[in-house]
Amino acid sequence: MLKGLRKKASILSLGSMASQQSTSSAINSESNYDKILTQVYDFEIALKAMDYLLDDRTKTGTDLLQNEASKNNNSEQPHAIFPLALGVMEFIEATLGFEPEVMAKAHKTLSEAENASLNNSKYNLKYQLATSMIYPPGTEFQVTFAESTLLNALLMLLTENNGMVESAKALFKLRRAYQTLDAVYKKIKESEPIFNKNLAKLKKEAAMQGNGTKSNSIITTENFSISTVDLPGYSSQTSSTSSLPQDISLMKNLEKIYLMRKSRIEGATLANNVNPERVNLFEDSNSSLTLAKQSNPKYEEQRVDNANNNNNSHDVGEDDSSSSDNEYCDASEEFDIEDTLNLPPPQIHSSAQSVLSSIETSPSSAQNASDNHLHVSTIDEYIHSGVQLCFGILQVVLSLIPPAIGKVLSIVGFRGDREVGLRLLWRTAITCRNVHGELALLFILVFYDGPVQFVDNGFRLPDQGNDKKIISLDNKATVSEAELDIILERPELYTSQLLRRARRMFPHNALWILQEGRMLAAEGDLALATKTMQDFTDDPANEIQMQQAEALLVFDRATIYIYQHEYDNAARDLIYLIDINSWSKAVYLFMAASCYLEKYRMIKMDIISVDNKESEMAKYSSLFDKYLDLALSYVPGHGHNAVGKKGGIGGSNKQMPFDKFLLRKSRHIEARKKKYPNLPTADIVGTSLIHELIYFWNGYNRMSSHDLEIALKLLGYSGAPNSEYSANTNGNLYALIEETEDEAMIRYFLQGITLRQLGSINDGLGLLDNHVISKYVISEPLHQFRFHKMTYSPYIYPTALYEKTMFVWLLRTKNTAKLDVHQAVQESKSWLKRAEIVGEGDYELSNRTGMRIKAAGDRLEQLATL
């Protein structure tokens, strides 16, 4: 295995390739032109197919790839980008739903893409095909190899039923991808000055046409001014007036590729909210090429004759072409691709619009955006955006790994830097109009607004940021480091701008509706979030093809309904999920049962009014029993419905963390049944199950004040009579069982967080200190910190100390007149260190707890530098 990996590494070594000639002008011969344009054409086809996926038209995209691949069955020239494009599409579907069949299919396709990339790299080296003006032959297939290897490794790591050998293979793949991406990224950074110099030169030559001077890099045809940037080594000095069949064919092929790129960037290919005949990105009135064509008196003389074009029209790759070489190079730190569509505003009723409407910005330069798009080749676009996306994801993912594991990985060459990774992803999302840009946006949205807390926004200095100085991301061709500093400080002000663009470009995909719903929920507008998501699925015109996207949308909508205490709607969605997704039927059903239990309690406490209280209580008690039993039957290795079925991530029969949580809660209930045999199951549950569950989906940070007040009351349902924040008194009892100390710790933990979100910071901290932390911490000072090892609810003990960190931060930063950031950071970090100590080891939900602690630590480190 290791020998095979070393062989692949040597084939794709950037260092060995760099020993070849690095400038395309000295490499490409006339006989290579058809092969080069064929490869560029393949990349445009692949990018177009992946755009269809982003618009939830996966079948259209896969059909396009298969049709193009079938045309080349007898060709000796490999087409590695096709299996990679298909693999990317299958990877997205696989990681949305973690369904075993889809994951296995994606793994197979990505493995084929790895081998195809190796073959294509060798082919380009053999024939010295330089598809880029700066990078050595085969560099683009280094990137395709790294991308397919990275995605394949991630799939293998997410497949829980893999043994040690498969896991080792996945780590080696990940390391290979890391090394390759790191090498190409360094090359991109080194080449930035060359790129900037030659981009300026290309623009200057285009402008010179306005004075009648012929350009080596621009062809002016009847309809368009076409850059020859996609064909390194080719000069257009005489081509625009040539009538030779090979020159005319070459120009037709260049024009075809140019129009494909133009259409993709404009979004005209997808025909969403845009009339392709009316939108012409590169014919902007201020474009350097348009100005050149309009002011050139020799334009009519330079047109390619229509008759010749019609008589000699060929597809890409059929004819050679002859021309002199040039000396241009092309590379950049940031790839300057930006959507400059002149489209009507999106029909999205969200807070994103209200935020954007109040922004005071200076307009971006559409001229620079369009010119840069025109003068950057498809291959260089792919290299830059692909490396930025993959390397950015790797950096962020590695930075999220808990410290103990991270130290081990760093020894073998894995070092994550969240700051570097996020900058790469933001740059890609802002400036790239291809699948890499949209995937970068998806990653950013999940990172900041997803249900799992990867970044802790609670650690913030008061009165930070000025909304009136928001940067407009519309038509941005480049983004500076200073601008990224501003964006990273207040990311929520910029995700809405990028999401608006994606919704406009890809209106049919439920993924973008899901992300808008998440963003609205993160902003606290839960009603609009559920309405947006519900309206989309209720509309018969919206047919969701990607079932995994539908499952994600429905699950997130269910959690938001829970935050609003709309438990019937939430349970309906959760039960529906078992028909469309196999991620964890046990968890879906357990959450549904917990919703029915909470509805039972709301009726009993008269929080909601019903016509027949006893009848409704009996109804929801019965529903709780039904779905709790059904949930247990689907737990892998436990229930009869799980026999022979694959559950969990990647289809293993192992129990996931929430399966273990479910079983632990079930054991507690069974123990109480023995103690209270005459009570219905709904009356022997302790602290609210659903309010405990939503903590893991960041629910308390998303609730409105009204929802938090209701949550505080519902959590008091199980409290001991006359205890703090209990709903029970000696004269009015809702709970029919005694509250144990362990259950009280869970209740006070959740009520403390609820009070903090309501603004009662001191009261919330009092509950946490007096009723939770004091129960297991023996010695508080960090240098002699000691604690009891408790097991009733394993996640509570480190998590309570993590939440104490947040309380300390808020208390130390609320007085701006006496604010000492350094002291606040140090005191908060000391409590976070205690959380790390208590949280060491593998326990139920340890990964989620570890990620929360890691996110808070990284944020505090960042604040310490301010």
UniProtKB/Swiss-Prot annotation:
> Keyword annotations for this protein?
Cytoplasm, Nucleus, Phosphoprotein
Comp. bias intervals (Acidic residues): 317-328
Its family remark reads: Belongs to the IML2 family.
Report the function annotation for this chain. Inclusion body (IB) resident protein that interacts strongly with lipid droplet (LD) proteins. Involved in LD-mediated IB clearing after protein folding stress, probably by enabling access to the IBs of an LD-stored soluble sterol derivative that acts as a chaperone in inclusion clearing.
- InterPro entries cross-referenced by the UniProt entry: Iml2/TPR_39
Q: Does the keyword Nucleus apply?
A: yes
Principal location class: cytoplasm
Which species is this record about? Candida albicans (strain SC5314 / ATCC MYA-2876)
Which gene underlies this protein?
A: IML2
Q: What is this protein called?
A: Inclusion body clearance protein IML2
